[in-house]
Each structure stands twice: as C-alpha cells, then as structure tokens.
Amino acid sequence: MFRGATLVNLDSKGRLSVPTRYREQLLENAAGQMVCTIDIHHPCLLLYPLPEWEIIEQKLSRLLSMNPVERRVQRLLLGHASECQMDGAGRLLIAPVLRQHAGLTKEVMLVGQFNKFELWDETTWHQQVKEDIDAEQLATGDLSERLQDLSL
C-alpha cells in the first residue's frame, strides 16, 4: 500500500528517484516493473506496479469497444500506458509525452494512493489540494453514504 506525498526531482533525462521506503516493496511485488499512464480526470500521471496495472487492463478489456465512451477510456489509458523499469539506482524513466501531459518539469509530487502513485507537478499539486479542501468545506451536506460512514 502506498500513502503520503513526497517531493521528488526529475533529472535532465526525465528520471525520478523512487523513495527508499517504496523500493523494496516494488522490487518484491513487481520486480521493479511499473506502468505509467495519464489520469483522464486530472493533470497528473498514474503510476502502477505491473501486477496492479494488469488488473486494470483486465477491467479495460471488458469494456465494449463499440461504446464510444468506453472506447475513449480504453484509448486514453492504454494508448498512453508506458512500461518503466526501476533501475539499479531506484530510478524510473518517465516518457516525455507523459511528462508533457502532466506538465512535469523538475519538482514532482509522488502521491501514494493505495495501489498506485499519482505524479503531479508540484505547483499544480498544491493548487489541487487547495481546491479539494475548499470544495470539501462547501460540500459538508453532500457526503455520500460511504463517506458519512468513514470515521477519521
């Protein structure tokens, strides 16, 4: 399980260094193999360990290619999916087209989200957090039943 937000730097080749606390888990569970794709709702990337991505692929394969909305989701997620292998130094190379999609330059937020990471431009991440907090404060009466049952 991945949690927390960590500031990491992209080097001049577009590689990011995976925080040490995640490396062993990624090596054990995925042999360091990851898949990166775009998020279709936000200007960030989604970074999955390969076994988790394979579950997503199975779900995507069940969508109907004749349904235009489902086909569009398949095209966006699979069409942008890029395999990346963690090297001996614990770095992952993020494809240029993906970096461009999310506006990633030097400072990147690596955000743990249970079975995957999100990769955000640092400035965009902070703006999104502010928007999320503001929206949550406005929506106190609009909580779903699942959120109402969540006790923190």
From Swiss-Prot:
Pfam families in alphabetical order: MraZ (PF02381)
Record-annotated SpoVT-AbrB domain positions: 5-52, 81-124
Location of the protein in the cell: Cytoplasm, Nucleoid
Record's keyword terms, sorted: Cytoplasm, DNA-binding, Repeat, Repressor, Transcription, Transcription regulation
GO molecular function: DNA-binding transcription factor activity; transcription cis-regulatory region binding
Main location: cytoplasm
Disulfide cysteine pairs (residue numbers): none
Listed GO CC annotations: cytoplasm; nucleoid
The UniProt record lists the keyword Repeat: yes
GO terms, biological process: negative regulation of DNA-templated transcription initiation
Superkingdom field: Bacteria
Coiled coil region boundaries: none
Role of this protein: Negatively regulates its own expression and that of the subsequent genes in the proximal part of the division and cell wall (dcw) gene cluster. Acts by binding directly to DNA. May also regulate the expression of genes outside the dcw cluster.
Family statement drawn from the similarity comment of this UniProt entry: Belongs to the MraZ family.
Subunit structure: Forms oligomers.
Protein name: Transcriptional regulator MraZ
Taxonomic lineage of the native organism: Bacteria, Pseudomonadati, Pseudomonadota, Gammaproteobacteria, Enterobacterales
